Amino acid sequence: MTATRGLEGVVATTSSVSSIIDDTLTYVGYDIDDLTENASFEEIIYLLWHLRLPNKKELEELKQQLAKEAAVPQEIIEHFKSYSLENVHPMAALRTAISLLGLLDSEADTMNPEANYRKAIRLQAKVPGLVAAFSRIRKGLEPVEPREDYGIAENFLYTLNGEEPSPIEVEAFNKALILHADHELNASTFTARVCVATLSDIYSGITAAIGALKGPLHGGANEGVMKMLTEIGEVENAEPYIRAKLEKKEKIMGFGHRVYKHGDPRAKHLKEMSKRLTNLTGESKWYEMSIRIEDIVTSEKKLPPNVDFYSASVYHSLGIDHDLFTPIFAVSRMSGWLAHILEQYDNNRLIRPRADYTGPDKQKFVPIEERA
């Protein structure tokens, strides 16, 4: 046996949820460009879970189901309030909150398709509120109740900031949610499928996925981009800062991709929203810095920006704390994780790969008295 490190290029399963072929991302056969410009996030949720777009009645029913389950349980609010959250990683808080949701759900270990779908609704509905509640509680603020007349994008911004978002803010966040909803068999999605393939429950699968996303090699790149932009500070500092990093052969966050060789198709949508939002907020320097960095890196390294690069300035312009960027990734990717979990349950086989052993061979046991 010969191992493929990182499983790069290994086809591990079949899936009908999303695909990446020739640098084109599709959800259930629909091009990401088409969906981003025309769909709501709720339509994407339905598409990923049912493998088809909803009609008006089906979409309205899904929205009502999500609205009904959107409130954060008081037990989790009290849990957040019982800790000093100053040094708590938001992803650790979210991971723990998902486990608590499982404890509070009487159907947690009921494994039939109908119960699993109901749990998927609860998880998708509650996760935005969990992130918003954590953010407010650690600032000494009370959580804001979600509005039944708002969709997920509107409600998240409303419950996070405590004020009605503008139409352009809702548009930007809706697009960001769609663009991050699924991405074939990435690390966290694969983790979720491995977990539930043992016939563990859906909450365990999502908790495992969040644990994988917490790692900086998967989630967190856009937070790194915003840290870089903050360090640069002004547009005129961008070129010397980036060239100094390139001379030292240091990594520039937000460029290149493991799968896309000629450019991430999601990046251009966030680039446009970054331009519009930063102009709206009067902080166009974030966009202008990003443009300057992109010009240098693509020229010098031949690396195009990925989805993380412009999402940083988009989220910053929406008033989102930088350490919440990865939890927001989870808010969106929840739809994809749940789609893959439901798909795994529907046609399950335990995932059990092999390892190429590289350790010593044919050793003889030595009594402890005789060991050096």
UniProtKB/Swiss-Prot annotation:
Induction: By decoyinine and nutrient depletion. It catalyses: oxaloacetate + acetyl-CoA + H2O = citrate + CoA + H(+). Pathway: Carbohydrate metabolism; tricarboxylic acid cycle; isocitrate from oxaloacetate: step 1/2. Pfam families: Citrate_synt. InterPro entries: 2-MeCitrate/Citrate_synth_II, Citrate_synth-like_lrg_a-sub, Citrate_synth-like_sm_a-sub, Citrate_synthase, Citrate_synthase_AS, Citrate_synthase_bac-typ, Citrate_synthase_sf. The active site is at H257, D308. Might regulate the synthesis and function of enzymes involved in later enzymatic steps of Krebs cycle. Loss in activity results in sporulation defect. This is Citrate synthase 2. It comes from Bacillus subtilis (strain 168). The lineage of its organism: Bacteria, Bacillati, Bacillota, Bacilli, Bacillales.
